[in-house]
């Protein structure tokens, strides 16, 4: 079989035109790539991206730049997106038993979420003044248009939103004991009744920086929380956002 060698004729105008086309094509591809956070916007909901949790704590020893200790809890307030850290007894005394927060991110990698509830003994707000309730709705965030009945909230047994040990669990993520990686469960939305009677829908989306669709690297930066929520300000049960 003959090897055919084609003569090379370099034309600077042709090369320049080709480079321009390549640049335009590359730019078009970049524009076509969906920003995982931009697609979360619906014009009504509040979208929180890469909210840093306790990134200095570690579950095991020998992690560069991190300390082997429990993760500090942080609180979050819906009305003004305020993050409140609980690092010591003084912080606990100032905040935990008040109505000045709505959800608490606790436990390993701040992955265990509680609503502010004075009646549940393991809740950060136990013994305080706030009485919230939460219900898991197994449907996509955009399809949740109505809050459940008050009877359903009163009867709810959902206390902690964390690791889902099974599909029947109320948790928001699966956790692999082999890879030690968290993966948010699709079509899980949490309806919340706040102490002032307002209703909220909440979707916990990701615990990894940049909101990647999937993670295979155990060392991917975490916890950096992405979540979205909508508070119905008029007190009705209307939670439609699309």
Report the location of each language-model feature:
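Surface-exposed, beta-sheet-biased, low-hydrophobicity segments with strongly acidic/polar composition
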Residues: 30-242
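Sec-dependent N-terminal signal peptides
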Residues: 16-23
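Bacterial N-terminal signal peptides that target proteins for export
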Residues: 3-16
